[in-house]
Amino acid sequence: MLLVEFDAGDIEAIADAVVKRVATAYPLSRAAEIAFDPVRQSALWRVRRSLFPTIIQRPGPRKAWGFVEDPIVPRDRVPEFMEFLVDLARRHGTVAGIYGHIGDGNTHYRPFFDPTDPQDFERMQALREEFDRALLERFQGAPSGEHGIGRIRAETLPRVWGAEVYGVMRRIKEALDPRGLLNPGVMFSPDPWWTSWGGLESRVPM
């Protein structure tokens, strides 16, 4: 599902041109719709906003864990990146929920795993390593376009900025917070991503 919203210019003409171009270029699963009625527009946006709740409530032991959920890539690489994400999940024995903000190149990617299953946990780690490598090297992207580095992406930060810039960032943090009292482990941590969850006993996705 792709929602495109216009707020300037000859909106009717622009929308018609976009629909024709998309319908010509891609095999659509259903006919494209142009909605001018505010009630219909609101209904379509409700579908978009329901994606995340729907994904995380999927039944079964495998849940949509958010450990690779906020990548951003150059906009002209988005189609290739989407294909990569679908294939990445498949090659690691699962499927994934994918949604996001395509105009920004920002994707929310949530593969389904059960981290309390040792084999699934190994798959999660392998997927994360391949994801990080491809995102940074092949797609020239970054691990977070919206949600921030936090704890879950902290170990990837040195690979994003390089040792020199990362070192400067750490020294600034240490100068302002020498005792490490402010948000310990956030952004600057060598620990594996999964330790930030404080254990993997919970089956509730994050």
Residue ranges of model-derived segments:
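Noncatalytic alpha-helical scaffold of FAD-dependent oxidoreductases
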Residues: 1-145, 150-206
